[in-house]
Amino acid sequence: MKCTLVSTLFAITNILVAHAQVSNSSDTLDVQFANSTNSYIEGKFNSTDEAFNSSASWSLAAQQKKISNAAVYDVGGWNGSLYRSNRSAVADHQPGKKQDAAISQISDGQIQATASGPETTAATTPSSTANVSVYEGAGMKVESKNMGYIVGVAALLFL
């Protein structure tokens, strides 16, 4: 009976952890600076198909990036709210460019980011892929290791 109870608790734990991972997925924006300038947001977030709405180009020979307008992301945090935006998603990878980013919450967690400044600048990043933290939610975020620990302690108490 105890084994059945423990097995049931572990099964419930796996279901809860999977649900927590889907509902509260990682707040990571994966921006790829390439010829296609495609980007995607992992997890439950939605984004436009093109990172810079066809206004960015990448020159491999001169290693220069031309950026005039950033993307519009529909990220929608917990309960569709935005808690903290990252204003340096592009500027972090263009140290030689003074980035003026205007990020505002429009509605339902939609962010519009516009960048202005010199059109071309030297790119010093060796890699063309960068992981940028977009925002973080307020309150407790259930992680798999924390959830497993909590349910594991609860299972030991029932034994």
Swiss-Prot record:
Induction and repression of expression: Expression is regulated by AZF1.
Domain of life: Eukaryota
Lipid-modified sites (GPI-anchor amidated glycine): G137
UniProt keyword list: Cell membrane, Glycoprotein, GPI-anchor, Lipoprotein, Membrane, Signal
Gene Ontology cellular-component terms listed: fungal-type vacuole; plasma membrane; side of membrane
Main location: membrane
Compartments it resides in: Cell membrane
InterPro entries: Yeast_PIR_rpt
Membrane topology designation: Lipid-anchor; GPI-anchor
Signal peptide segment: 1-20
Positions of the propeptide removed during maturation: 138-159
UniProt keyword Glycoprotein, yes or no: yes
Name assigned to this protein: Probable GPI-anchored protein ANS1
Chain positions of PIR1/2/ repeats: 101-114
Organism of derivation: Saccharomyces cerevisiae (strain ATCC 204508 / S288c)
GO terms, molecular function: structural constituent of cell wall
